[in-house]
């Protein structure tokens, strides 16, 4: 299987580069990079992306920067992207003591307040994609709000969550005030 996977990935990479030699190629991976290395496909694209949810699906928030350093050591000459990260936030839930998987607005803030500075201070991270801009329907979800993935920075009814304003404050040139 791994040999076949490498053949297919090599063919796709070669085709992309033959059609547009200026276009960057990227492989999105989940956090278990060794699987992709065993298949030999991490060497093929120009960029590597990783879906990282340290402190949400498991582990703790501090595991995020540890994982970033680990990936940089594994792939020192490869620009890296964080292709997915986020925490479910239900705008109806608040907590004075937010914890992982409580779906509170406050844990969502803690999560993004931890991740964003860690991403921005590393020059080998060339991009990051919050999962997701908007909450969206997902039939299989059975969380605080059934059938909805609440990782968006904006709710399904377009209410901007606290995380939305955090990104504005970091990335907008004009000052942002959100109370």
Language-model regions: role of each:
Residues 2-34, 39-179:
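Substrate-binding clefts and catalytic carboxylate motifs of secreted carbohydrate-active enzymes
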């Amino acid at each position: 299987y791994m040999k076949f996977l490498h053949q297919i990935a090599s063919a796709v990479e070669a085709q992309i580069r033959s059609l547009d030699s200026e276009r960057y190629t990227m492989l999105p991976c989940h956090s278990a990079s060794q699987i992709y290395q065993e298949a030999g496909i991490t060497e093929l694209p120009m960029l590597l992306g990783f879906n990282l949810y340290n402190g949400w699906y498991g582990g703790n928030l501090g595991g995020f920067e540890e994982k970033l350093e680990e990936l940089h050591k594994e792939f020192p000459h490869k620009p890296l992207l964080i292709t997915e990260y986020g925490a479910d936030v239900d705008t109806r839930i608040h907590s004075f003591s937010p914890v992982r998987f409580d779906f509170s607005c406050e844990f969502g803030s803690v999560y993004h307040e931890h991740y964003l500075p860690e991403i921005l201070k590393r020059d080998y991270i060339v991009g990051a994609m919050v999962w997701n801009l908007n909450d969206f329907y997902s039939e299989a979800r059975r969380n605080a709000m059934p059938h909805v993935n609440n990782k968006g920075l904006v709710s399904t009814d377009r209410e901007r969550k606290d995380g939305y304003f955090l990104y504005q404050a970091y990335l907008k040139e004009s000052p942002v005030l959100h109370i």
